[in-house]
Amino acid sequence: MTAVFPGELLLAEGIHEIARVTALLSGPLRRAPRVAQVVGPGFAGRPWAPRLTDALRPLDPTVVVHDGPTTPDSVAALARQLRAIRADVAVAIGGGTVMDAAKAAAALADGGPPDADRVRQACAAGPAAGDTPPAVRVVAVPTTAGTGAEATPFATLWDLKHRRKLSLTGPRVRPSAAVLAPELLAGLGRRALATGILDALCQGAEASWSIRSTPESIRWGTSAVTLAAEALDQVQDDAPDAAARLALQRAAHHSGRAIALAQTSSCHAISYPLTLRLGLAHGHACGVTLGRLLRYNHAVPAGDCADPRGTGHVRRVLDALAAPLGGTPARAALRVERFITACGLTPYDALDVDHRSLAAEAVTYPRCHDNPRRLDRESLGRLLGERSEMEETCG
């Protein structure tokens, strides 16, 4: 299946579509395209790697390995590699780290010689109006179940030197095409699938409840949550079938569509210091506060509402998000918190973190203030310091 969505993102499903989509993107060329196959260090060990390698063989790609977190240094190095082989298309096969690295590198590869400082400057500059398409087009092929990076016009980078999360943003960063292949989730364990589904849930929820949300972002976001909810039990039981794996990939993609319109908000703002301090996987770091924020936002009083559309709008959105997860925001929150524990992930209450210090850092990220109920250092510190409903139920 192949479809083109607004914004000219070409979407296809199935490993067999990757080479065809790549060829479509390079159609105007009067020569064979130069293709970079960007992968992570574990690519060769994945059970589907031989099949994917065979599918790309007609394109004679140059394999480029991106190792470690996506940082200004790693993006600069990858951009130099893309320049060295004069790539026309980069096929990014991996999770959010690999896809974001390829997106950022492709966006910066046709400027001057890239280095880490230039990458930081590009992140600080923000999106530029009227950007021309990058010389290197990106085909994003997700091999995890959560990031939605194949649909977004931004890439997450980690400045480990300054302990900050960075974002490279703009139309040049969005992939030209995405290929969803649920068979690429084969071999992922329960924890990996769980962190992915938590990321998709948070992205869908945050892009829906954000004060920047639009009717379209709410539609994509609630669809992402609905699709993810359908697969929760199978992931928890460590037995997702083919239909569940496809639902996971579609949920992630829909969540990416949602945040491309409205971005993320509070769960993600809290997740960044959790990842930097404790090394939590991204989806895990986001998901541990989703239950708290579902309850907190649904209980918004008029005097605390940050959304100009009012408390009625906020509650309607929260009710729509909660429906597929348990019927009410309280039940949805409890289901998410129980899912985290059942999948062997550490819940927020068991993390070794100072609530007030975490809150103080989280509110420095502007997206924290896109939450529909106002959050400041004091209110967020109190919220994080409360015992979860699950702990109270089990205690």
Swiss-Prot record:
InterPro entries the record matches: ADH_Fe/GldA, ADH_Fe_C, Alcohol_dehydrogenase_Fe, PhpC
Cysteine-cysteine disulfides: none
UniProt GO BP: antibiotic biosynthetic process
EC numbers on record: 1.1.1.309
Record-given protein name: Phosphonoacetaldehyde reductase
This protein's UniProt keywords: Antibiotic biosynthesis, Iron, Metal-binding, NAD, Oxidoreductase
Organism: Streptomyces viridochromogenes (strain DSM 40736 / JCM 4977 / BCRC 1201 / Tue 494)
Origin organism lineage: Bacteria, Bacillati, Actinomycetota, Actinomycetes, Kitasatosporales
Pfam families found in the cross-reference section: ADH_Fe_C, Fe-ADH
Similarity-based family: Belongs to the iron-containing alcohol dehydrogenase family.
Disruption phenotype: Cells retain the ability to produce phosphinothricin tripeptide when grown in liquid culture but, the amount of PTT produced is lower.
Catalytic activity: 2-hydroxyethylphosphonate + NAD(+) = phosphonoacetaldehyde + NADH + H(+)
Source organism superkingdom: Bacteria
Residues the record lists as binding Fe cation: 199, 268, 282
CDD domains: HEPD
GO molecular function list: alcohol dehydrogenase (NAD+) activity; metal ion binding
